[in-house]
Amino acid sequence: MRQSGRKSNQLRPISLELSPLINAEGSCLIKIGNTHVMCSATCETTVPPFLRGQNQGWITAEYGMLPGSTSQRIKREAALGKQGGRTQEIQRLIGRAMRCVIDVRKLGERQIIIDCDVINADGGTRTAAITGSYVALHLAIRSLMKKRVLKVNPLISQIAAISCGIYKGEAILDLDYLEDSDADVDSNFVFAGNGNLIEVQGTAEKNPFSEEQFLAMLKLAKGGAAELFKLQNQVLLGS
């Protein structure tokens, strides 16, 4: 039995608040249990040097955690003078994931920057960031099309992400911090809207895990992603 009382295939309570930031083209505050992440999408009329003159755009991402987002204060990376390896890994993951669901050729020479700021961390911050970032990106594209900055919708697919793990010998969905810190296996799954995989991250913390255990986690993750896609559609269609 999970300490939270949740079933093995049960997500934490989820909410998606649209457009909490008034200046970004698109923004979303995602809450999954006690993990809260502010996601925004901002358009700039510049592209990285390697894309100049090619009439296509780019999507990149930045990720950070507020000092008070965890039980012990995190030092600001700006004050330290450099980003940590975990931060770089996560923001590259978010950028890669977003580029899989948008046709950058339809952006023209524009760059969309996804910003993910963790307000409260209780496990699954990177997966929450991806799920919330899609909503922010969708709203940004909608805004750019309404302003006629973009003539064609470049979005190809939805995207959502969720964590799974092996905890006390059982495959479970959407780990909170206590589960994650004591899990035998910790994994993250990123899905496109059609159920195809965009990225899988999986690590054995203690002992190697079997193919059977991996498939059990994959099954749970697909079910969780389906719920996330449904919620994304509900809030976006209602806005």
Swiss-Prot record:
Its EC number is 2.7.7.56. InterPro entries: ExoRNase_PH_dom1, ExoRNase_PH_dom2, ExoRNase_PH_dom2_sf, PNPase/RNase_PH_dom_sf, Ribosomal_Su5_D2-typ_SF, RNase_PH, RNase_PH_bac-type, RNase_PH_CS. It catalyses: tRNA(n+1) + phosphate = tRNA(n) + a ribonucleoside 5'-diphosphate. GO terms for biological process: rRNA catabolic process; rRNA processing; tRNA processing. The keyword rRNA processing applies. It comes from the Bacteria. One of its GO terms (molecular function) is 3'-5'-RNA exonuclease activity. Keywords: Nucleotidyltransferase, RNA-binding, rRNA processing, Transferase, tRNA processing, tRNA-binding. Phosphate binds at R86, G124, T125, R126. The keyword Ribosomal protein does not apply. It holds the Pfam family RNase_PH. PANTHER family: EXOSOME COMPLEX COMPONENT, EXOSOME COMPLEX COMPONENT RRP41. Belongs to the RNase PH family. Homohexameric ring arranged as a trimer of dimers. Phosphorolytic 3'-5' exoribonuclease that plays an important role in tRNA 3'-end maturation. Removes nucleotide residues following the 3'-CCA terminus of tRNAs; can also add nucleotides to the ends of RNA molecules by using nucleoside diphosphates as substrates, but this may not be physiologically important. Probably plays a role in initiation of 16S rRNA degradation (leading to ribosome degradation) during starvation. This is Ribonuclease PH. The lineage of its organism: Bacteria, Pseudomonadati, Pseudomonadota, Alphaproteobacteria, Rickettsiales.
